[in-house]
């Protein structure tokens, strides 16, 4: 099941071919390298877009990262816990 969070994170992301893709992020003083993005979607909030990314790190942990274009910030919004 997922645990809902709203933790600010630092993200290194690549923007190419009109696509934004997170590459790694820092959460709780630990760097997680994204091994794959399993899904991405966006939601319009007023005039701004909120982008969501379901990602898996190198240790097969599953996270949902959220990028707010208006605030230009990232948060860790969900983490898979067993």
Each predicted region: which residue ranges?
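Cysteine-centric segments in proteins
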Residues: 1-82
């Amino acid at each position: 099941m997922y645990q809902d969070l709203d933790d600010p994170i630092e993200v290194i992301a690549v923007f190419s071919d009109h696509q934004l893709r997170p590459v790694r992020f820092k959460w709780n003083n630990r760097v997680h390298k994204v091994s794959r993005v399993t899904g991405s979607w966006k939601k319009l909030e007023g005039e701004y877009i909120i982008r969501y990314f379901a990602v898996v790190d190198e240790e097969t942990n599953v996270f949902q990262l959220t990028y707010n274009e208006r605030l230009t910030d990232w948060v860790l919004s969900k983490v898979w816990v067993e």
